[in-house]
Curated annotation (Swiss-Prot):
One of its GO terms (molecular function) is methionyl-tRNA formyltransferase activity. This is Methionyl-tRNA formyltransferase. The lineage of its organism: Bacteria, Bacillati, Bacillota, Clostridia, Eubacteriales. Its EC number is 2.1.2.9. It comes from Heliobacterium modesticaldum (strain ATCC 51547 / Ice1). It catalyses: L-methionyl-tRNA(fMet) + (6R)-10-formyltetrahydrofolate = N-formyl-L-methionyl-tRNA(fMet) + (6S)-5,6,7,8-tetrahydrofolate + H(+). HAMAP family: Formyl_trans.
Amino acid sequence: MRLVFMGTPDFAVPTLEAIVAAGHEVALVVTRPDRPRGRGQKPQPSPVKEAALRLGLPVDHPACLDNEFVQKLKDLGVEAGVVVAFGRILPPRLLDAFPQRWINVHASLLPKYRGAAPIHRAVIDGEKETGITTMLMSEGLDEGDMLLKRSLAIGPDDTTGQVHDALAELGARLLVETLAAMEAGRLQPQPQDGSQASYAPMLARADEQVDWSAPAEAVHNRVRGMNPWPGAFTMDEGKILKILRGRLRHEGLPLPDPTGSAAHPGEILQIVGDEVAVATGAGVYWLSEVRPAGGKTMTAGAYARGRRIGPGFRFG
C-alpha cells in the first residue's frame, strides 16, 4: 500500500520502521519542523525525520496543511494515511480527501484516555492496564471508529518511560496488522461509546507537584507517572526537589508509624542508607532518587545527609 506517514516524536519511530519492513511504500513522511534543542539551542530534526532520512524516505514539514498539500498527496498516488503522535490536528479538507483511509495509532484503550497525554495519565491514575487502539480519524478528538485493540499490563512500579517504550513497539505491530486487514477488506470499524470516554489532557505544572496529603500509593503513582519526563517534584524550603524514584516498602525494616501526633504529611520519618521515609496522608513513601534544582541526580539518603535534614523535617 502506498502511504503518507505523519508523526513527530520517538513514539512514532517504531511504527514507521515497521511499515517499511512490512513492504509498504511510504510516499512521504510529514513531521514537525526542526526545533532548537540542547545547550547550544541548534535546530535539530524530530526523531521521525531522523528515522525517515536513515530509511531513505522523502520528508516534508509543511507550514500549512492546505489544498496545495492535499493535491501533493494525490499527485504522489497516496492510498491511505498513518498518523502517530503528529502534534497537529488534521483539517477536514485532508480527512475528506481520503475518506475512511486515515488511520491513527492511539496509546490507550479507547474510549478511555482520549487526548494528548494518555500514557502519563494512565500511570498517574494507577491503572493496571492500558494498550493501543488503531482507529479511523475524525474531526473530533480521538473520537473516530475503532479498528483493532491490544492491551498491555502496567506493573505496580512501571514508569511512564517503560510503558511508553512498550506501547511504541505494540503500536507498530498493531498498525501493520491493521493495514493488512484493510488491504484484505477484513476491517470492521466499531463506534466508540462516548458515555465511557475519559480524557488525558496535556500535563500542567500543577500535575508535577507531589501532594503529601494523598495516600502513599497515589504519591508513588505520581512519581512513576512523571518519570522520566517532566519529573515529579516537592518543595524544600522554597526550592524545587525533583523526585525521580521511590517505593512503597523497604524490605527487611519495620514500617515507620506515620500516624503519631508528630507525623505530618511530607515529614521525614527516618533515613536508612540511600532512602528516606516520608509520611503521607495514608502510609509511608520511601524516596530513592532525587535531583535538586540545578544539581545532579543522587540518592535520597545522600541528599538528606548533604542538606543535614532528618526526622522531623517537612517537605512542602
